[in-house]
């Protein structure tokens, strides 16, 4: 039985993010890396998350924190609403909403992630949290106001 990819692509996991998470392939661009990293959170794969963080970030030191977080978080969905990169610059950005429940409460991470390409491989560097007004449209694309959607 085939399983849809957790990244929200509507493609089977085996044909979408699995080749990246399993190490068969390297993500070709920041959006694919972002989606595969989301899958790694869903599948509780700390090794892939650490491997795809830029080495300068010292992600290996976060292993215990990542694993502890897996036990309390259920990921509900990912919406990528903007992505841009130029291979010539070796830098890219992906803006997304990742929805989750933790301790019985629903939440969302809204982030503009920054990626760097080195030696043919994209790495996650860091992210910023954009500010939205309570009455702004929610960036997840629901059509609702931010305060009634991901801003709760």
UniProtKB/Swiss-Prot annotation:
InterPro entries from the UniProt entry: NTF2-like_dom_sf, SEC_C_motif, UPF0225, YchJ-like_M
Similarity comment: Belongs to the UPF0225 family.
Protein name, per record: UPF0225 protein YchJ
Organism: Escherichia coli O139:H28 (strain E24377A / ETEC)
Lineage: Bacteria, Pseudomonadati, Pseudomonadota, Gammaproteobacteria, Enterobacterales
């Amino acid at each position: 039985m085939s399983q849809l990819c957790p990244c929200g692509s509507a493609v089977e996991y085996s044909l979408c993010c699995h080749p990246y998470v399993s190490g068969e392939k390297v993500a070709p661009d920041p959006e694919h890396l972002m989606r595969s990293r989301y899958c790694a959170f869903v599948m509780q794969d700390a090794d892939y998350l650490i491997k795809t963080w830029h080495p300068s970030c010292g992600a290996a030191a976060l292993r215990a924190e990542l694993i502890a977080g897996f036990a309390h978080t259920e990921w509900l969905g990912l919406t990528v609403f903007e992505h841009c990169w130029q291979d010539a610059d070796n830098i890219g950005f992906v803006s997304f909403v990742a929805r989750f429940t933790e301790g019985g409460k629903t939440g969302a991470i809204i982030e503009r992630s920054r990626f760097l390409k080195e030696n043919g491989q994209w790495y996650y560097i860091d992210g910023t949290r954009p500010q939205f007004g309570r009455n702004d449209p929610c960036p997840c694309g629901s059509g609702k106001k931010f305060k009634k959607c991901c801003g709760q």
